[in-house]
């Protein structure tokens, strides 16, 4: 089974999801998205899978509000995420069974 996690090692939820995946016997591909940001196409695919760019937008601890992204259209949000990956909520899990924003962490269990 091929699983990828968009991961931030400083995030407790992201670490918990990574541990859940590993506990299932799978070693996922780990993308530290703050170091290696996803391209615009990957962002668009994930946003579509999780319910739109607004669902993927991280608000707490980011300049999303100051940037006018609350209530903005998908194209505007995705363009901002492409330039500023701290705006991407995490962890995102991509698996053969689907793609989810794993908040809370237990949501990842449905993909394992």
Where are these regions (language model features)?
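Local sequence-structure signature of Cys/Sec-based thiol-disulfide redox active-site neighborhoods
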Residues: 1-24, 28-36
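Thiol/selenol-based redox catalytic cores and closely related redox-interacting motifs
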Residues: 33-112
């Amino acid at each position: 089974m091929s699983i990828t996690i968009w991961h931030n090692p400083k995030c407790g939820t992201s670490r918990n999801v990574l541990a859940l995946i590993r506990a299932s016997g799978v070693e996922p591909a780990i993308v530290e998205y703050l170091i290696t940001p996803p391209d615009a196409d990957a962002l668009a695919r994930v946003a579509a899978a999780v319910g739109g760019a607004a669902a993927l937008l991280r608000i707490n601890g980011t300049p999303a509000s100051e940037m006018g992204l609350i209530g903005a259209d998908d194209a505007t949000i995705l363009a901002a995420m492409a330039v500023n990956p701290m705006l991407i909520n995490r962890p995102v899990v991509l698996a053969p069974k689907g793609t989810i924003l794993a908040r809370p962490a237990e949501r990842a269990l449905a993909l394992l």
